[in-house]
Amino acid sequence: MATTKSFLILFFMILATTSSTCATLGEMVTVLSIDGGGIKGIIPAVILEFLEGQLQEVDNNKDARLADYFDVIGGTSTGGLLTAMITTPNENNRPFAAAKDIIPFYFEHGPHIFNYSGSIFGPMYDGKYLLQVLQEKLGETRVHQALTEVAISSFDIKTNKPVIFTKSNLAKSPELDAKMYDICYSTAAAPMYFPPHYFITHTSDGDIYEFNLVDGAVATVGDPALLSLSVATRLAQEDPAFSSIKSLDYKQMLLLSLGTGTNSEFDKTYTAEEAAKWGPLRWLLAIQQMTNAASSYMTDYYISTVFQAHHSQNNYLRVQENALTGTTTEMDDASEANMELLVQVGETLLKKPVSKDSPETYEEALKRFAKLLSDRKKLRANKASY
């Protein structure tokens, strides 16, 4: 896991130094990345609803959807579920869920998904309801049918390797054209919370592939932004739609990364004296919390540093609440009271400044992003018409 992240970091540091091309809006590659976090996915859902509303307002089109504006949408765990909801087509080949439908989905299904199984030795939740509702909502849709490029991560515990589901890699790896509900359950199957997911796929050549998957956070440690950028880079190099991009650099990337919130005390903090008394189980729980928090911080640090170094800091926006308290820190508290609190967290976050050094609020930054996304979409459409 550390090796994979180190490779991605090195890859993007090298990429950032290879070109100083001045990009036009029409040549930009747009990326949306959504973190994992269980029921805390309500927080980025609030942000997505606001952004989609802004896009509809800017383009005077109530049917505008996020998938119309982003070249790559990536997510892990609950972020993978959100990715599927806004990219899976309905019978009219439009996203089956608008951004405003996501929060009601959590309120309706969250309490049933996080319904304690009562098992002492198995996972906390049996996952049956989650798989059932995913099958009902996503049907038989497969990766290749997604309305834009997706990047949803999981981890195969049999091969001990990450599995990344994307459209652009299907020509080389047709076995990855799995059903979206299998992918969504797999990326959400957090160890200790849900059982791992087994399924098979068949290729046109008759080959059978089996998967034994758990939560995508095992592969991406909760924040899929680097993964999403990697997929976007490959897409820009291989997709004819981006043929005008001769040499990709960060001036040609527009990245929106949505977090699911961290504790005001950087998740839970401990003293050396306290930790010295822990056994293996206590350490296991603490390490998971520490790893997720540290990874989210470091990923943001790496990406923001590179964007700033190439004078493209306005092309990257990380939306994250770092002051969660009480029940809002829990990924599996699906009580109505806590979900209402999470909605309030998201709404309050919109009014907060992006950083201590800037008076710009997240709401203002998202409006700016909406304008960029709209302008870029129009420029590309005009170019395609000639």
UniProtKB/Swiss-Prot annotation:
Main location: other
Protein name per its UniProtKB record: Patatin-2-Kuras 2
Motif (DGA/G): 215-217
Additional remarks: Patatin have a dual role as a somatic storage protein and as an enzyme involved in host resistance.
Glycosylation sites: 115
PROSITE patterns: PNPLA
Enzyme Commission identifier(s): 3.1.1.-
Signal peptide extent: 1-23
Gene: pat2-k2
Residue ranges annotated as motif GXGXXG: 36-41
Keywords: Coiled coil, Glycoprotein, Hydrolase, Lipid degradation, Lipid metabolism, Plant defense, Signal, Storage protein, Vacuole
Family: Belongs to the patatin family.
Function: Probable lipolytic acyl hydrolase (LAH), an activity which is thought to be involved in the response of tubers to pathogens.
One Gene Ontology CC term in the entry: vacuole
Listed GO MF terms: monoacylglycerol lipase activity; nutrient reservoir activity; phospholipase activity
Coiled-coil zones: 321-384
InterPro entries assigned to the protein according to its UniProt record, in alphabetical order: Acyl_Trfase/lysoPLipase, PNPLA_dom
GO aspect biological process, one term: lipid catabolic process
Subcellular location per the Swiss-Prot or TrEMBL entry: Vacuole
Record note on domains: The nitrogen atoms of the two glycine residues in the GGXR motif define the oxyanion hole, and stabilize the oxyanion that forms during the nucleophilic attack by the catalytic serine during substrate cleavage.
Pfam families named in the record: Patatin
Chain location of the short sequence motif GXSXG per the record: 75-79
Species name: Solanum tuberosum (Potato)
Active site per the UniProt annotation: 77, 215
Start and end residues of each PNPLA domain: 32-229
